[in-house]
Amino acid sequence: HDDYKKYHHAIVWGGGNVAMDCARSLVRIIDDVKVVYRRSEEEMPANKVEIRDARKEGVVFNFLENIKESLRDENGQVVGAKVVKMELGEPDESGRRSTHEVADSEYVEKADLIVMAIGQKVNFKPLHDSLEKKEGHVSSLENVYIMGDAYTGPATIGSAVLEGKALAKEIVQSFEE
């Protein structure tokens, strides 16, 4: 998109499939794209083919690093990120290895665009308690459809777009019946 052509140094913060989608899209229009991820490549949840392809396209990976804050100029424009090096600890409750900041390891990474693509868990329990999934994306409530993460669990942006198109056709067909 033309709006992004004004940027020169992008940081994508995260290690999942959405981060890979963002980084791979940005590297096609911005020369300097880095992915900052707080764990090692082995712990990275993104699809390994996506990581490999992002690397081939020119995305640089900064593993075992985390963003502490974005830095802005006097006009409020992003000019960089304060980054800290991380080290792996023992596994947490989820089984993933915990991370800890390395003392005195902060540095500034130049950036005029920071994309936050860190995982967030959404609590769908209240929704699931009141909805029963019927055929396709139809729920037990009239004119209420289920899609996206509520339907499939966490997935990629690309799969959400395809699913949205399929659901739109499904809704149109229901009106035609």
Model-derived regions, located:
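Rossmann-like dinucleotide/flavin-binding elements
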Residues: 1-48, 107, 113, 117-132, ...
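A broad structural signal for short, well-ordered beta-strand segments within beta-sheet-rich domains
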Residues: 7, 67, 76-78
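A conserved beta-strand/loop element that lines the FAD pocket in flavoprotein oxidoreductases
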Residues: 58-67
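A structural signal for short hydrophobic beta-strand segments in well-ordered beta-sheet cores
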Residues: 67-70, 137-138
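Conserved beta-strand-loop-beta-strand element in the redox core of flavoprotein oxidoreductases
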Residues: 72-106
